[in-house]
Amino acid sequence: DFTKDIYINKDKIREDEDFVILYKGFLFSNNLTNDVYVSYGYGDTWKNKDEKKMKPSTFGYLATIDVGSGDNLQFVFRDNQGNWDNNNSQNYILPIEESQEVLSFKTIAERS
């Protein structure tokens, strides 16, 4: 479950798209550090695990995540002093939807 301290800029995340995550959790609110990272992977086994340093802002920490394939994206936050925000050891989880290929067709008459 998400808390009021984590926001994303899309209603749903999809394969092969990116999204921005805004973190305002205790690592930000307690001002413990200037360096916060988001660690993430796909599925229960954290396939293709990656980590990004988040950019500080007055609103929280920001990162853009390029979504790969999997059923869900699991992620946690950490700082450079060994403090973690991992949703009480449950991780934060977002379901991933398959990419939606949009095709646009025109009649031959419209192409002339």
Task: List where the protein language model places each region.
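Glycan-association/targeting regions that enable binding to alpha-glucans and other polysaccharides
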Residues: 1-112
